[in-house]
A protein has these predicted regions:
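Charge-patterned, long linear interaction tracts outside catalytic cores
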Residues: 225-231, 380, 385, 474-539
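Switch/communication elements of ASCE P-loop NTPase nucleotide-binding domains
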Residues: 1-34, 232-358, 435, 532
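Electropositive, glycine-dotted interaction segments
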Residues: 72, 76-178
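Extended helical coiled-coil dimerization/tether regions that scaffold
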Residues: 152, 158-275
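RecA-like P-loop NTPase motor core
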Residues: 315-316, 321-429
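Activity-critical C-terminal alpha-helical subdomain
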Residues: 432-506
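Conserved P-loop NTP-binding catalytic core
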Residues: 26-91
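Flexible phosphate/Mg2+-sensing switch loops adjacent to catalytic phosphate-binding sites
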Residues: 34-59, 125-131, 262-272, 331-333
Length: 539
């Protein structure tokens, strides 16, 4: 990572292509905020170098971590008192801690690590013992990174806590089981215990690498006779904990979580610690149904979370406001997210339905080609394939917009850093859509060329008829070509005898038989433009 500025909310799901720097970001957070006793010192390998030019490695690195109180005035509570000197009042009424780490690398390979706390203007605050304050900050807000075997091997120090708290975990589970059975929701004691057993198995799945090799305690691993049933019970328990008034259960769950963690490895968390949870690709080795239950459970933990994923399934379980796209640009990694202002309630509902629930994987795309309906989706995908363009491999998604409206999709794409291009018909509705695009582009003619293609015909059927495919329409309509009949009637009869999508596929297949030269020039130009947009967004 050369440069990155990342605003974090309570829940964050980070997505991006393989080269955006995921491992570097997670490594930096894990090393700088590790709950180990020693503060981290930078090494030569931590400094950025231009890809392929290791001799061009930088000599300076600079990281600022900003911590904000959850509510104005919270910085005064007991657990934050030792950090009194580090808090800075800001114009929005919140207090923040700006913790800066700098690395300086000398010619002889030695590296110096400097720490400071800053005021809101970026000037260092005069603090008595900076390292002591930094240790306290990390003790209160450590990072816990779930399941990345490679990384855990790198920082593992092999010490095992003397007394594993296995019996405490059993006690907490017992207490949670008793609490839950007083609100049974039609679950018997046995079923609750089976569900909790699945919960522990699940947490173990995520902590399997957190800690030393010898400390692999298997807690409550009596294999349920029917594992599927256990998962179902866990799902019901999740929902019980998640309803209003379930806060006490969440606190118990958090205690269970901390105990499990300590029983598994080398970590001792401060009693006041509120860890930041890093969850790397939680979909690994989990069936989609299990993933849904697992994700619900992780969301119940009252902790700030950063998850990374390549799973459309997981994105469909995540409000779009929590998703952050990271895109590598020439001089930095750009972070795109809706942000606190988000979308209007109606736009948010439309995007949730159209994208999150029905096309979650389109959030991974580099460019959206927005078309009016199903006909265009079939024709465009097929004709692009005939021209040798593989939209999937190029990160291009064809999305129909008639159902959700054009404006919310374009607004959302822009806020998320996704390139876009719109194809409209030449009828009245199409002209309105084109006007919408122009208004979004402030009537900039140059930008219009990049983002808008309008068919010089009423719709895709009329356009393809005039582009030399009239024989297909006559054949499907079962009307000989020499019979005098206007094209609107021929098209209408053809649609009546098959359907709009089937007719579209028929036309595209015919184009495939005739070869690339039969694909209309207007569409070829559009394909080139969309590919150009997508490649500009590629790493």
């Amino acid at each position: 990572i050369n440069r990155l500025s990342l605003m974090l909310e309570q829940n964050n799901v980070l997505i991006g292509e393989n080269a955006w720097g995921k491992s570097s970001l997670l490594d930096a957070l894990t090393l700088l905020l590790s709950p180990e006793s020693e503060l981290y010192h930078f090494e030569r390998d931590d400094f950025w170098f231009p890809p392929g030019d290791i001799n061009g490695r930088e000599h300076h690195l600079h990281i600022i971590l900003t911590f904000r109180e959850s509510l104005p005035g919270r910085h005064r509570v007991r657990r934050y008192r030792p950090l009194e000197a580090c808090w800075t009042p800001c114009t929005d009424g919140y207090h923040r801690i700006f913790y800066r780490l700098e690395g300086e690398s000398a010619e002889d390979g030695s590296v110096m690590t400097l720490r400071s706390f800053l005021d809101k203007d970026g000037h260092p605050i005069d603090v008595e013992d900076i390292n002591d304050q930094a240790r306290h900050l990390v003790r209160l807000m450590p990072v816990l990174r779930l399941r990345d075997a490679r990384f855990m091997r790198r920082i593992r120090n092999g010490t095992v806590p003397n007394v594993p708290n296995v019996e405490v975990t059993a006690r907490q589970l017992d207490f949670l089981a008793r609490e839950l059975s007083s609100h049974p929701q039609n679950l018997s004691d046995g079923q609750i215990r089976q569900g909790l057993s699945a919960m522990v198995q699940l947490l173990e799945h995520y902590f399997s690498e957190q800690g030393a090799g010898q400390a692999r305690y298997r807690l409550m691993r009596r294999r349920a006779s029917n594992e599927q049933r256990s998962w179902r019970y866990l799902d019901i328990i999740n929902r019980m904990i998640d309803r209003p008034g379930g806060r006490s259960y969440r606190v118990i769950l958090l205690g269970l979580f901390a105990t499990l963690l300590q029983a598994k490895g080398t970590l001792r968390l401060d009693k006041d610690a509120r860890p930041l949870l890093l969850i790397e690709d939680p979909e690994t080795r989990l069936h989609p149904i299990m993933l849904s239950v697992a994700w619900h459970l992780l969301n119940l933990l009252p902790l700030q979370r950063i998850a990374t994923t390549n799973s459309g399934e997981l994105l469909s379980l995540t409000p779009v406001e929590h998703v952050c796209r990271l895109v590598r640009e020439s001089s930095r990694v750009a972070a795109w997210r809706l942000g606190p202002s988000g979308l209007s309630t109606e736009d948010s509902r439309r995007i949730s339905f159209h994208i999150r629930f029905n096309r979650p994987s389109s959030l991974f795309a580099r460019c959206w080609l927005l078309v009016e309906g199903e006909t265009e989706t079939w024709v465009i995908n097929e004709l692009a394939r005939q021209c040798g363009h593989h939209f999937d491999a190029e990160g291009i998604k064809v999305i129909e917009f008639a159902q959700s409206g054009l404006k919310p999709l374009v607004k959302f794409a822009r806020r998320m850093g996704i390139e876009w291009h719109v194809l409209v018909d030449g009828d009245e509705a199409g002209k309105k859509y084109a006007a919408t695009v122009r208004s979004l582009l402030n009537n900039d003619r140059e930008a219009e060329r990049e983002h808008l293609t309008a068919l010089p015909a009423l719709d895709m059927e009329h356009f393809m008829y005039r582009q030399g495919f009239s024989d297909v329409f006559h054949r499907v309509a079962q009307i000989p070509e020499n019979v005098p009949m206007n094209l609107r009637k021929v098209i209408s009869k053809a649609i009546h005898r098959s359907s709009k999508p089937d007719l579209a596929i028929e036309v595209a297949m015919e184009a495939g038989r005739r070869g690339v030269d039969s694909v209309p020039t207007l569409l070829k130009k559009m394909f080139s433009r969309v590919l150009w947009l997508a490649r500009g967004r590629a790493d």
